[in-house]
Amino acid sequence: FPKDTKALKYLANQHGYQLKTVEAAVDVNSTQKTRLYEKACQRMITFQGLKAAVLGLAFKPGTDDLREAPSLDNVKLLLEGGAQVMAYDPVAVTNFEKHYPEGANEKGSIFYVDTVEEALSGANICFIFTEWQEIKNVTPAAFKKLMKNPLVYDGRNVFDVQAMKEAGIE
């Protein structure tokens, strides 16, 4: 867990120790946060004007905790790229909105929706950052039906890759 490794690194430094393995883990955790966005950049020419569904804002299901949540860094990059972000999370929206108020942000915009289906409706691309049950309940066929372009980056391995491909989702 990123919070634990950062705390361990801090404590070691306070006592004059350098834990290289822990420091490496902290570095890897940091770069992993935007891995999905980086993968999407290899595929997309631009995010300007694209509708991006973001499913899950919290660090993990069952909490509204945003500390170390990959959604924070990725939404920032999407907004800077000019995307219209449709964000869904059953409990973390209030906390997330403190970082990104609804409406115009950076070069893009963000809107908070009440259902996964609302987020997916007409989306060009989808990012999954938290494995909420509400997200798991959506079928691959629903992604295909609702999205304008069914391109999904599943950061929590919620869905079976083969089942998604068979449904026509990239």
Q: What annotation goes with each model-predicted range?
A:
Residues F1-E170:
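Structural/interface elements that position substrates and couple domains in central-metabolism enzymes
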